[in-house]
């Protein structure tokens, strides 16, 4: 059972993740009670020999769980270069929320959220 059932494109140079025509209610398996989903990506360069690391996190994109097709672009603010000799790790994070009186609350203290390693180079 996968949380995300949508295709995406990862640009390994910039760390950008692109979803074309994402339909949240059809392509994201949300827990009962969720009204919104947040997506972000992370780009980590880690040099295992020197322990030098650089992490870049994209701004969060928050969407209602509806049937509207939406293009989503998750772009880290900079390239995670570290020393330039490390390993690049690419992550995708999905978090669920419930809207109550126009305030979004995390469901069950984040127990339904997912962080997936999507590529290593």
Question: Can you describe what each PLM-predicted range is?
Answer:
Residues 23-62:
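Short helix-loop boundary/capping segments
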Residues 7-25, 30:
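Contiguous beta-strand segments within globular domains
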Residues 12, 32, 65-69, 85-87:
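Surface-exposed coil/turn segments at beta-strand junctions on protein surfaces, enriched
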Residues 51, 66, 79-81, 86, ...:
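Intrinsically disordered, low-complexity segments enriched in serine, threonine, and glycine
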Residues 36-46, 84-111:
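Internal, hydrophobic beta-strand segments that form the core of beta-sheet-rich folds
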Residues 56-82:
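A beta-strand/beta-hairpin structural motif
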Residues 1-5:
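N-terminal "mature-chain" segments and other terminal, solvent-exposed stretches
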């Amino acid at each position: 059972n996968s949380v995300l059932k949508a295709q995406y494109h990862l640009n390994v140079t910039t760390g950008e993740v692109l979803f074309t025509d994402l339909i949240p209610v059809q392509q994201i398996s949300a827990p009962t009670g969720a009204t919104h989903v947040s997506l972000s990506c992370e780009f980590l360069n880690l040099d295992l020999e020197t322990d030098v690391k650089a992490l870049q996190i994209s701004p969060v994109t928050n969407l209602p769980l509806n049937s509207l097709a939406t293009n989503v672009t998750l772009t880290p603010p900079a390239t995670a270069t570290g020393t330039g000799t490390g390993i690049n790790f690419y992550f995708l994070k999905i978090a669920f929320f419930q809207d109550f009186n126009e305030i979004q609350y995390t469901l069950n203290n984040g127990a339904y959220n997912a962080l997936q390693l999507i590529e290593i180079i």
